[in-house]
């Protein structure tokens, strides 16, 4: 009986992967592989479509067909399985100022993001400040950028990884 269970599980796993969008599967596999390597002071950026392509040896850019809020949920779920790192989420403070008239969909986006933040360490900082932190970190640490199909101003989500066994407070 147990000889049948493992092959059945493998077949189901592989058939589930075949149904997934290749771009989705690629960034998720890369993130999963990188989570074993990365630690405190590494970053994950969930970026809107116009986010610049950073250069450098520690920068890896992936593309997702999902929206930023959908990718955030996927990333947070993966991070919850990891004991060695915890997310410190940073969002641009300018996001609060954008109106629905200027950027249709922004209200829904903010609401979706705000539902995921309670119980997690998160901050609002000016976009320029967060970008400086990313540029500094990229000189010494790994930064994984996941570009999404979101096209809303100031909608980038920045996650600095912190030690999972050390309370930063």
Feature annotation, model-predicted:
Residues 14-16:
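C-terminal motif of bacterial Sec signal peptides marking the signal peptidase cleavage site
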Residues 18-68:
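Long, hydrophobic N-terminal alpha-helical segment
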Residues 42-45, 60-61, 86-90, 121-124, ...:
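Structural motif
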Residues 89-97, 102:
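Long, position-biased, composition-driven segments near the start of the mature protein
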Residues 1-7, 12:
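Sec-dependent signal peptide recognition
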Residues 52-54, 61-87, 107-124:
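Feature captures the catalytic cores and cofactor-binding loops of soluble hydro-lyases/lyases
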Residues 37-40, 82-84, 137-140:
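Flexible, charged surface loops at secondary-structure boundaries
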Residues 101-169:
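Glycine-rich, aromatic-bearing surface loops/beta-hairpins
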